[in-house]
Amino acid sequence: MENASALSPAGDLTHAQFPAGHFVIPDTNVFLHQMDLIESPLFVPPIILLQTVIDEVRHRSLPLHSRLKSLIASEDKRIYVFYNEFHAQTAVVRQPEESPNDRNDRGIRLSAAWYATHYASAWANRSSTSPTIVLLTDDADNRRKAARDGITTLSVREYVSGTKSSAALLDLLAAESVEGDEETGTKQGRRKVLYDEYLPQATLVAGVKSGDLHQGYFNANAYNYLEGSVNVAGFPKPVLLLGREAMNRSVQGDLVVVELFPESEWKAPADAVIDAEAAQRNDNPDDSASEGEHSDDEDAKERKAARDTAARNPKEKQPTGRVVGVMKRNWRAYVCHIDRTSLSSTLSTLSAQTVFATPVDRALPRIRLRTRQAPELLGQKILVSLDRWDAHSRYPDGHFVRALGQAESKEAERESLLLEFDVPYRPFGRAILDCLPPEGDRWVVPPKETGRPEWRDREDLRELIVCSIDPPNCQDIDDALHARQLANGNIEAGVHIADVSHFVHPDTPMDNEAASRGTTVYLVDKRIDMLPSLLGTNLCSLRPYVERLAFSAIWELSPDADIVNVRFTKSVIASKAAFTYEEAQIRKDDPTLNDELTQSIRLLNSLALKLKAKRMAAGALNLASPEVKIHLDSAESSDPIDVEQKELRETNSLVEEFMLLANVSVARQIQESFPGTAVLRRHMPPPHSNFEKLQDLLMKLKGMTLDVSSSGALAASLDKCVDPNEPAFNTLVRIMATRCMLSAEYFCAGSVSRETFGHYGLASPIYTHFTSPIRRYADVLAHRQLAAAIGYTPLHATLHTKSHVEQIMSVINRRHRLAQMAGRASVEFYVGLALKARNLAQQDGQGVVEDAFVIRAFRNGLAVFVSKLGIEGLVTFKNEQEFDPESYSLTLPGPNGAVKVAVFDRVRVKIRVEQDKNTLRGKVKMTLLSPVDSTGF
């Protein structure tokens, strides 16, 4: 940001209409609707940003206000903030019967006029023409009034058309326009209305309050583009939405309002796979036949498909309804490809044309956009922002933001992942780096005898036999452990955690950035750090053979692992070794080793086994997830060379048990000390209805019962789900049970009732995260609260305020969820690359053959899980199969007669990764080989 008094003399000289120079004053709607344009490095005019505009953007959209603040702070933009509300000649008072919006528009016009007069006066004695002050607004009435007052004003499109980068900047314009377009309006008037108009906001709010309408988040069906659902609080099952009309322009994650149909009209979810890409392949983005005048036959077919796939199993009926309004859009920029078939072959290369952009997220609809760069963008991943979705339009409209690179290149795929899951990956700015110790990587723990502040109230634990146990190549070592026998027969065990809060002080630029990022994000080939690497992989990392600051939890435990007492202390440690899980396991099991370090690991392991037994006896769940390990080429290419299931050893459990013990102990301490604002983590019990399908599957296909009355009952039931003929069956059931669970979440202790604190999966009445402050911001907050609880330092004011803690919890819950999704998507991408490489390595190139398990049956296909690769896929059939929803099975024709395939069956599949020639999306295609070869049907 530059100060208004430091305005450069003539502003920008490159615009065709203003050769003598100019400045722009955008109104509020320009920032609300054209932020991608303003942020573009190609948009170069100096901007006079009015206080009125800043305040209005803040009230209308906090995310856009955050982006605006970043622009103001950017050194790449010439933005001059003018506090017009405090200037005697530009401040305005709202007039009687004047709306707040009209008052603000009048204030903006007055400021523009004042600046124009001010500049003309300053230029009076110069021979050259004074620069022009240009008011940018897409409000036709505002432009008319400005012109009446002698103010130079242009619409955004008019202004951009005169810039030297107009071809690229015009593509960035949002499809939505405040004033509308006469031609477009006429065209829209001729179109058939496809969707019901949304109810007014006041009607929606009143309806939800009265209970006549219901509110929840929209979820698209991954298997059927004609079906969606809305999770409504208090409903045992989601509200089902069948067909485009019922979903009514909802986009994944939108907060929508639904109207329930009478119970006689309730339906069951789909029992068939309906692929959007195949159904929409022939749509024309620029043809009204693909829009409001879409063929009545096509509409009828879609409605029939939605009905036919729904009501086959009356026992599974659930609340059914339609969307009548949207409370909050979840729209953002989406990673897409240009659909090759939507390009016009008759237009010139530089002509603007309407094309389809297909999002990589299959839960999203195709997006229409106009661009002059369509031919150049083919084959690339691009970023597209959603702007509007009109009732007469089959698809939403958006605008091009920028190109990300060639599809399937690792660089473009990595950036796509980060953007798709909203992972902040910008380099740490100067203000953040200035928070680091000035010594940089030469910082060391000072000698104790110097009496430096680092040693204040810290225990000297450097002589303890401490070690860390982590995955291979771990650089951000958060935790280390020790155990030793005590003279009284008990055992001392310690968990030592990196003292991140010593370096990250509250309400500093580095702290605010860590709070915004929320967590470190781990991709297969890259780590996006929450904190600068100087801290995460060096000064805070508990490396071996160097002294480090720590926060220690130390227990006295009985030989049976009962807690005698626990204490918490700031400390200095010197780790004696950094093991991988495999190295620690080998050391523990080696009978020839009996040194202090090995004895400590064995002692820790014996305690961990007892701690785990106690947890399981209390009802903790032993669930499973399909985790795989990607082996990358050590060369610069980092190509995947193999995929294997992760192997879990005793030492994995050893570390897990002591981290759980530390987290539970710290949770008790901080909740006792700060009952109103303690940062805790909970896992709510899932509704019993979440398990109904799995219970029915187990009973009908295996004769097994699943008791979900409590976590302990569920754990005992899962232990009994054993098939002697299929060793992997129990793991498969545990994976399926995991998917019935709710997600764990961070929360503020004073915001919920005490009865809801518990962690269902761990069977613990209270829990928090303390053990990974290098990579989780929640742990940093827990450290600060624990330090205050033991009297080490006063608690910062921000952690005394419940509303502030609630706000942080909301951010880090979202960041944590998105980070997990980004990590899984990265694994899926590299598994796909590995499969493609294996396909190419085979002589026939026909695909990789693996065992899989059927996890779901449809009328026209099977969903299968390939445990070795940790991936799911669809095997689809076009004809001749017979579907039985009661037995969750398909009967397929075989060479020796019909063969029945049901959920839980082991099958053999051929796997290929194909690239859709239109969308450029990689798609896993599976074909059944055994018990029936489905290649021919």
Predicted regions and their residues:
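Short linear interaction motifs
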Residues: A4-A10, T28-F31, K237-V239, P365, ...
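Active-site-proximal, substrate-binding regions of enzyme catalytic domains
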Residues: A4-V134, A140-V178
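Charge-lined substrate channels and their catalytic hotspots, especially those that engage the 3′ end
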Residues: V178-G494, S501-V546, L890-A902, R921-F937
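Short coil/turn segments at secondary-structure boundaries
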Residues: D36-E39, R60-L62, A147-G150, E158, ...
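Electropositive polyanion-binding surfaces
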Residues: R362-P365, L383, R388-A391, Q406, ...
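Eukaryotic short linear interaction motifs
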Residues: L32-Q34, E39-S40, I54-H59, H65, ...
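Short interface patches used for recognition in eukaryotic signaling and trafficking proteins
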Residues: T90-P100, S127-T129, F235-L242, R366-I367, ...
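Structured beta-strand/turn binding interfaces of compact recognition modules in eukaryotic regulators
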Residues: D27-Q34, L50-T52, L136-D138, V156, ...
